[in-house]
Amino acid sequence: MIETRSDEQKYAFLRTEESREKNRYGDNIELAEEGNALREVSLNINGDTGISENPDRYKQHGFYLNADNCIGCHACEAACSEKNDNPAHISFRSVGYVEGGTYPDYQRLNISMACNHCDDPVCLKGCPTRAYTKFAEYGAVLQDPDICFGCGYCTWVCPYNAPQLDPVKGEVSKCNMCVDRLEVGLKPSCVSACLGNALDFGVIENVPENREQAQAEIPGFPTTDITHPNIRFQQTRQNKREMTRTDSMPLKYHKDEEVGKYKPVVDEKHGVKKQWNWKALLMTHESSHVIFTLSTQAILGAFLIIVLGSFTGVEAIVAIQSSVAYLPLLVLMNVLLMFGFYKLNMHLGKPHRFYRGFYNLRHSPVSREIAGVSLFFSSLLGFSVFSYFEIKPLIGLFAIMGVLSGPVGLFYMYKLYRIKARPFWDHWQTASSFVGTCLSLGSLTIVFVALIADALNTTQYISLVVLLLLGLLLEAIGHVAHAADLKNSEGEGSASWYLQTTRFAWPYIISNVLLGSSIIVSCLLLDSPSSTLGWLILGLSLLSTAVIRRSLFFALVIPTTMPGAFFWKNKAFEEHAKETGLANMPQVGVRYEEHRTFKVGELIDTIKTTTAKEAIDQLKEIFYWKKVK
């Protein structure tokens, strides 16, 4: 363990005092009772097998912020980054602020925030690689960047923006509670460095000396209902009724006089002018998700239509299966799904570690989605191969596998976006959009090949038109309901609606027009279902609205997160720095995302150095959901 300095100040040491049994959420503060197997186990920090004798070692600890004392000097940030050797663009602890009033009656409230080591860490449950662990020691939630493959899902689900995705290394890292310092009785580095005596640390719910409050909320802090964070606040000064953010997030905090708490509301700081912003919409990191979700849903829809249509004797499907178009259709489906997988994998920070996506089947919807869609892809591939050789028993086997695994993958694709920390996604419209896309793009895929091969007669197209129309109507109903709910909501959801009608207003309007046009053309095709021109218009309209709407799905989401500052943690400044070249200067704290490479050599080395026993033990941990010794 590290050695304490002989001149270490008294304020840098942890206090030992009586604590409560339960915290304010009803969770136990003592995380491992006497006799528990988790006790008296070394954390093996840097290979050190020592075990601390701290009597509070197995109690939940947390940070304490006295906002009255925080002067916004950023000493806590500097100390944290120095200790963890972080580059300028990564900071485990950040100081943001909200402000209210006007000069001379102006007020600024600084908020210093790192990981809150929550009682119910959603990052741990969401991470598909099991890179997160909540320890009985101090209740620390620790993350291993070496295990992380850089999907960034933990950064989506965390309400406090604690996990930091490094665009250079392609991995996530975060606050580790300075457990090496805790083991020798010292408080975390950020606390020891605080100039204003604003930060403190100790057993949760224990109020530090010379403090009056231990609140769980403060203006700008997201709701505690999601994760039960282990941080407490004091702020005795009276705030203004309205506190605003200086970053680009279109949010401010308005005090509800009835309950005495602040709630986020829309701040129309960017005006109400309708804008285009095509580049910001279509050329983003999330474009890979757009391609993957659309291609997967289209191919799943086409597969289910083929298999279930064949089973029920739908004339159009039977005709296609007996035509020359059938095998090319299956080849096209495999190619499109493979391309979607490729784009998804290459957006990872470490694409050669793709196999780690299966590690957290117990908790993570991402792992379950990957498992379901991967099994569906295998089923589609087997179905296609044995359809070529006309081996009916195996065709039937892979058809059943695909019909079962595909919807499971789609369900968890939907579940992984139902994130409480991202209200724009947390709506049933996400499901209606995904299912609607399956029906519409799935039908369109089949019709596209059938038209080229002239595989169907006029009346046989009608069943596919009906399915396509049902998909479009389902999407339209979902979008109308979603828009109505957003307009009537508060907070981040209504802020997303504000962006949808301002920054991305014209793409949103165009997508609505295209969706309506697609529905009208589909209705017209019921009268002339074999019209090549009609299908061409419908295809272009449908594909355009699908791409625009799915891109909006990712561009409009606003997470619940802590306020930033004018430069630091300000998305608008980050975009400006990248556009102007400021991001080339390391001291600016903004970096371009580096191109990802599939490091075949590292993957081969891993395969060579992993013994059969280690591989089997890893599989047991995945499927038996318990540690294998």
Q: Which residues does each PLM region occupy?
A:
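Non-ligating segments of multi-cofactor redox enzymes
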Residues: 1-294, 302-311, 316, 335, ...
